[in-house]
Each structure stands twice: as structure tokens, then as C-alpha cells.
Amino acid sequence: EYEDPDFYIVEELSRKIEEALQRLPDSYREAFELNRFQHMTYGEIATCLEVSSKTVDYRIQQALKLLRVELKDYLPILLAIL
């Protein structure tokens, strides 16, 4: 068992982020995850997905916008534990 209360907060926050990611449209989530988790550039993602870099930029910006709205209530928690 973990005794650090921050562990449970981080675990809950991670779960909420994962749930929010799953609710994104597939095209937004794919571009976002390739950029943020696979560290691919917009150009690399564009080549991989066979779309323009502008389309990749749009999809990632939309994903961020939706995630900000969805996770806005958790920002104070995140800031408190950092």
C-alpha cells in the first residue's frame, strides 16, 4: 500500500486524463498522442497520417482545446501537487 496521499491524487488525475483522451475524436487523439507521447514532429505525423502539417496542427490544437475544457476542474489539484 502507498501511504503518500499525493500518489492517489496523481493516480486519479492520470485516470481522468486517460478518460478524456479516449473521448477525443480519433483523428485528434491520434495526432495528439503521436506528438505528446511518441515525441513525433508535426511533419513526421503528417507523413505518417498522410495529411498536411496544417491538418496535424489543427487536430492537436482542437485536442488541447477539448482537453482543457474537460480537465479544467482538475487544474488546481495538479498545481497543488507540483
Predicted regions, residues:
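Acidic, proline/glycine-rich intrinsically disordered inter-domain spacer in sigma factors
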Residues: E1-E19
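Residues within the DNA-recognition helix of helix-turn-helix
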Residues: R59-Q62
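C-terminal edge and immediately downstream basic/flexible tail or linker adjoining helix-turn-helix-like DNA-binding
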Residues: C48, L64-L82
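Helix-turn-helix DNA-binding module
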Residues: E19-Q22, D26, E30, Q38-T55
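Generic non-transmembrane alpha-helical segments
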Residues: K16, A20-L24, E70-Y74
